[in-house]
Amino acid sequence: MSLWLPSEATVYLPPVPVSKVVSTDEYVARTNIYYHAGTSRLLAVGHPYFPIKKPNNNKILVPKVSGLQYRVFRIHLPDPNKFGFPDTSFYNPDTQRLVWACVGVEVGRGQPLGVGISGHPLLNKLDDTENASAYAANAGVDNRECISMDYKQTQLCLIGCKPPIGEHWGKGSPCTNVAVNPGDCPPLELINTVIQDGDMVDTGFGAMDFTTLQANKSEVPLDICTSICKYPDYIKMVSEPYGDSLFFYLRREQMFVRHLFNRAGAVGENVPDDLYIKGSGSTANLASSNYFPTPSGSMVTSDAQIFNKPYWLQRAQGHNNGICWGNQLFVTVVDTTRSTNMSLCAAISTSETTYKNTNFKEYLRHGEEYDLQFIFQLCKITLTADVMTYIHSMNSTILEDWNFGLQPPPGGTLEDTYRFVTSQAIACQKHTPPAPKEDPLKKYTFWEVNLKEKFSADLDQFPLGRKFLLQAGLKAKPKFTLGKRKATPTTSSTSTTAKRKKRKL
């Protein structure tokens, strides 16, 4: 009797087909129309360590402006579909829509190079572990000292049409079956958040939430002890399917360790006994094994600058090749090489003839200067059924902004019109206006820059435009033509002049 037995070999089924993400070059046609747009001089001045607040209502009198902050510029562009072009024959508004493509950018930075320092008047520093003078095994009640330092050196320029994504270590939630006692080490969790204007960069102490992970507020300098230091999540932004958050980025980081210290306080996790041989006398008790360094960014030089230079976008790292969806662009800038903190002094009394410290008040300020220049290329999209379906799956608000949909039927019904519209005998005739479109990014803080009225087709009138024409091999259109100069009329003379005879050589 023959029986059918199932095969024991493993059978692999093909995966379920998914929609493929394509490059914007597949459905975006570029034109030969270019525009220049630039900001005015952008300035920011404030206190480098903390905001100055009014004692009564905590109103910020002086904002916090530090060279260790992210500057996230949200660039608002005009709608090209409502743009006034001298010649509109290059596209069909019934079947096509226009978009901007960023092809050139230059981030200008003013102010001289300089190194800004920070510190803490009560930093948790126990001993100098690099050059220890004595074995400090028993710490006192309060060993905090006044320590200052410079930070890690960072230069960053990141461009996309969506806000940049950052990462940092925060306090996680323990499992419900784990008992948590006061003083236990909190669990860590990698958190992704949007990088906003004014967020602190990694200064050399790690990308972490110092507010929740350092309870004594004395582990790091003043400007970050109650802040979150974020680091751009390049891995997440590069792996984004549509590539909107990161067209390209420029990055330069450097750091070395200047001093080596250890922390005061009870050691939460003791050194295992098998890692050392117990001592006697002053070494009977182990010193604190919680070591930490003070970072330093070393020398700043103009030879290693990534700013004040033009950059041309030929091919983006993702599928979005520079298309500015939603008519907006995000430029994220970090430059710690111009982080000088200016010291200001104001005299309380000018009648004293002998110097006294109490006669003067000292202040700190930090100033920043930016200038953003762009070259945008006009592009058109033919709205076929496949393209519209793809764009709707990518971002449904794009088609809504284009006002692309079914037209309402003509109004053929009879309408009622009352004479006394304010009478209480009839229903209210006041129509409620439609609610304005809500900004999906209104809960975030950005440096808003409006370029809707700063587009110009005269590229040769701007420094970045002339650089673009030179590298692209294009010529600016002449404004006027020079004709041949006419000969000046001469008065006729009655006397005849003898013609010069030709002579053979």
Swiss-Prot record:
InterPro entries linked: Capsid_L1_Papillomavir (IPR002210), Capsid_L1_sf_Papillomavir (IPR036973), dsDNA_vir_gr_I_capsid (IPR011222)
Subcellular location: Virion; Host nucleus
HAMAP family (alphabetical): PPV_L1
Keyword Membrane belongs to the record: no
Extent of Low complexity compositional bias: 488-497
Pfam families named in the record: Late_protein_L1
First-listed, main subcellular location of the protein, grouped into a coarse class: virion
Other comments on record: HPV16, in comparison to HPV types 6 and 11, is more often associated with malignant genital cancers in humans.
Subunit structure and binding partners: Self-assembles into homopentamers. The capsid has an icosahedral symmetry and consists of 72 capsomers, with each capsomer being a pentamer of L1. Interacts with the minor capsid protein L2; this interaction is necessary for viral genome encapsidation. Interacts with protein E2; this interaction enhances E2-dependent replication and transcription activation. Interacts with host KPNA2; this interaction mediates the nuclear localization of L1 capsomers. Interacts with host ITGA6. Interacts with host SDC1; this interaction promotes efficient infection of keratinocytes.
Protein name: Major capsid protein L1
Keywords, ordered alphabetically: Capsid protein, Disulfide bond, Host nucleus, Host-virus interaction, Late protein, T=7 icosahedral capsid protein, Ubl conjugation, Viral attachment to host cell, Viral penetration into host cytoplasm, Virion, Virus endocytosis by host, Virus entry into host cell
Lineage: Viruses, Monodnaviria, Shotokuvirae, Cossaviricota, Papovaviricetes
Gene3D superfamilies according to UniProt: Major capsid L1 (late) superfamily, Papillomavirus
Post-translational modification: ISGylated by host HERC5, this results in dominant-negative effect on virus infectivity.
Family, per entry: Belongs to the papillomaviridae L1 protein family.
Start and end residues of each stretch annotated as Disordered: 480-505
